[in-house]
Structure formats: C-alpha cells, structure tokens
C-alpha cells in the first residue's frame, strides 16, 4: 500500500505542475493569437518563428498538455486501485471532473493553430459528434456557429478553450486544493521538495525548448485527400470507430457515456479486492495499447503529412518549376527556354560571383517586387513565407558549397 500511495502522490503532483504550466503558457499564447480563419495560422506561425519566447510557449503548452493527460490517467488509475475512492468521494469526483474538463480543453484547443491537421481533424471530430443521437447535431452546429466552418468557428472554440473551460478548470482545481489543503501546505513547506521541484521545472524547460510543437501547412479546405490523425491519447477511440462504422453512435455516444458513468459511479460501486481492481485497470490499459498499436500500424501505409518546414520546401520546389524554370533553367544556369528565345540577361545561380553580390533579403525583395522589365513581381501571388522558402530552395539547390 505504501508504494501505491507514493505513486498517487507523485502523479498528483506531476499533474498539478503540468496543469500550472499549461495554464500559464496558455495565457502567454493568447496574448498574440488571433481567433479567425484568416489570421489563426499566421498568428501561430508568428509565435513559432518570430515572437520572442513563442517557440518555447507553444512547446510548453503542447507537451505539458500531453504530460497532463498521461499523469492524470496514472493518478486516477492508482487512486482507484488503492481503494480510497469510497472514503474520499468528493476528492475522486472532483478529480474525474477535472480530468474530463482537461480532455475537453484539449479537444477545443486542437483547431486553434488552423494548420492542415487542426482543420481536418476538427472536421472529423465534429462529424463524429454529429452521430450522437438527438443532441449531437445541435452541439456540433453550436461549436461551429453553423452547419459548416465559418468566421464564427474559431472565436467560439477560442472562447470555449481559453475562457469557459479554463475558468471551470481553475474553479475545480481550487475546490480540490481546499479539500486537501493540509497536504499541499505540508509539501510546500518542505525545502527539499521545493528545491527538487524548481530544478525539475528548469530541466524540463531546457528539454522542451529543444522540441517544437507540431505545425503543418496552413489549412486547405480543398485538400480532400488529407489524412487527419488525432492526438496519441485519442488514437484508440479513432481505431475503435473503424470497427463500428455500421453504428457510429456507439463510438460517439454509448462508449463515452459508459466510461464517464463508470468513473463517476466508482465510489458507490462494490469495493472489490485490490487484485480485482488492478485487473480492471490492466485490462483497460491492454485494450488501449492494442487499439493504439493497430492505429499506428494502419497509419504506416498512409501518405505522410509533412510539417510546416518540409511542406514549404516541397511547395518551393513546385513554385520554382512553375514560375522560374522557364527563364532560369532546371539547373539554375539562366539558360531556360524563354531566356534563350528572347536573349534575357538571366543570372547564373551556380556562379560564385552571383552570390558575392547578393544576399537573401535582396533576393526576397526582387522576387516580391520584380526587377526591370524582364523579371516579374510575385508579391501578389506568393506570401512572404512562400517567397522566403523559394529563395532558400534556390540557395540550397544552386549555391556553390552551400551550408545551412
């Protein structure tokens, strides 16, 4: 029993730390985020690439959310195995409610980056929600602000994620702390605990800063071949849905209802022996692992969705072939068919002298504004990010002895 208490305590403390980091990083991100279909992705990209500390905030928010889902699951599992749910009913109910709110917050925040996975993943989730008998279509339309994605969709999800659910989570957390106030005071008054906590958070910051939160290309509603995939903790439900396509309401309604009903009813259920409670948790973990594993295996045969940098590089190559190759040639020698036909003074990208007399910013300006009567401007047809990716592609492909 001593080891169980230790796991419950550690997972509870880890969950609180992750939750605190999620809330604080979320506040930081909300200061620069614009909840609109046109500005949602540019705001996210600005945070990731140009804002001071934006990369760290996004990584902190994303990975702390995943850590919170995992540590919260560990806490609830071992709290249940310990057999204290009947004795501490109020604590258990608050913990379950808090965990469900966290899952809901993860769902509502998924669409905010407005990249490909966010857009298509949310469309799939809402279509699944619509299969819930009676209330499903009403809830889905309310979240979208209509029957389809529109200008009201992102503001609604942003308000739900950053205000409604965040406030409710803070309220539940406050009530939970009040029920165990003496335990928190005991921990916080322990100097060794405080030092360990501070060092752990600092190491976590250093580690997280080396990883980027996922970001794909901007949402493209016309890309019907895109394969959205949920977060790792929803993969099992996604896979389960494949086996009940004949009755999707089982995935969207019956299964969640049974799961939530069981969690809230645990304190009033017959208190089985610890061994039986352990078997129930292990069985659920095995089901989760099998379904998640099957989902990962099925995904191996699907088209890989590139991240933002890789996707922009692919688009840059296509843009070069579409816009530049007729003049500059496939090898960047300036010997394209139009250059030869009209005797145009096209630069040779493979010559060292060209790169001595130019730089990245100058090339961006030329591509954007054009040069003379022969070089057209592409400022209206390409975004700044697309122009930058095109210039980088030219440097990587043709500059002699190029090094990043």
Residue ranges and their predicted role:
Residues 316, 320-331, 375, 390-394:
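The canonical Cys-X-X-Cys-His
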Residues 297-321:
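Electrostatic cytochrome c docking/interface patches
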Residues 185, 337-341:
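Short cysteine/histidine-rich zinc-coordinating motifs and their immediately flanking basic loops
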Residues 148, 341-399:
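Extracytoplasmic electron-transfer domains, predominantly the class I c-type cytochrome c fold
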Residues 173-178, 260-269, 291, 373, ...:
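C-terminal capping alpha-helices of c-type cytochrome domains
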Residues 332-336:
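Short glycine/serine- and acidic-residue-enriched loop/turn motifs that recur at repeat junctions
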Residues 244-247:
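Interfacial "cap-and-anchor" motif at the non-cytosolic start of specific transmembrane alpha-helices
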Residues 1-240, 251-284, 288, 292-300:
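Membrane-embedded alpha-helical bundles that constitute the cytochrome b-like, heme-associated redox core
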């Amino acid at each position: 029993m001593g080891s169980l208490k230790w796991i419950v305590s550690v997972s509870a403390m880890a969950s609180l730390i992750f939750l605190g980091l999620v809330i604080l990083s979320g506040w930081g991100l909300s200061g620069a985020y614009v909840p609109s279909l046109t500005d949602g992705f540019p705001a996210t990209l600005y945070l990731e690439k140009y804002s001071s500390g934006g990369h760290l905030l996004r990584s902190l928010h994303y990975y702390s959310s995943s850590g919170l889902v995992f540590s919260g699951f560990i806490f609830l599992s071992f709290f249940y195995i310990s057999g204290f749910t009947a004795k501490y009913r109020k604590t258990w109910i608050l913990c379950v409610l808090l965990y469900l709110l966290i899952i809901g917050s993860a769902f509502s925040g998924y669409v905010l980056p407005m990249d490909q996975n966010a857009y298509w993943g949310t469309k799939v989730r809402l279509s699944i929600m619509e299969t819930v008998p009676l209330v499903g279509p009403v809830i889905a339309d309310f979240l979208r602000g209509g029957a389809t994605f529109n200008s009201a969709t992102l503001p609604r999800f942003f308000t739900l994620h950053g205000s409604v659910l965040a406030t409710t989570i803070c309220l539940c957390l406050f009530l939970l702390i009040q029920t165990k106030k003496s335990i928190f005071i005991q921990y916080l008054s322990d100097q060794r605990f405080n030092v360990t906590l501070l060092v752990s958070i600092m190491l976590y910051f250093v580690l997280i800063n080396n990883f980027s939160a996922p970001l794909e290309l901007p949402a493209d509603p016309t890309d019907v071949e895109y394969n959205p995939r949920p977060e790792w903790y929803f993969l099992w439900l996604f896979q389960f849905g494949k086996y009940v396509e004949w009755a999707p309401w089982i995935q969207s309604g019956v299964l969640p209802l049974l799961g939530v009903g069981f969690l809230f009813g645990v304190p009033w259920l017959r208190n089985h022996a610890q061994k039986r409670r352990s078997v129930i948790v292990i069985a659920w973990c095995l089901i989760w692992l099998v379904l998640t594993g099957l989902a990962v295996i099925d995904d191996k045969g699907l088209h890989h969705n590139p991240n933002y940098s890789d996707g922009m590089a692919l688009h840059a190559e296509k843009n070069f072939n579409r816009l530049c190759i007729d003049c500059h040639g496939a090898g960047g020698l300036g010997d394209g068919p139009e250059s030869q036909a009209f005797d145009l003074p096209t630069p040779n990208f493979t010559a060292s002298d060209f790169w001595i007399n130019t730089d990245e910013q100058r090339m961006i300006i030329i591509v954007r504004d054009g040069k003379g009567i022969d070089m057209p401007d592409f400022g209206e047809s390409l975004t700044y990010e697309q122009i930058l990716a095109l210039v980088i592609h030219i440097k990587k492909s043709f500059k002699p002895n190029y090094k990043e």
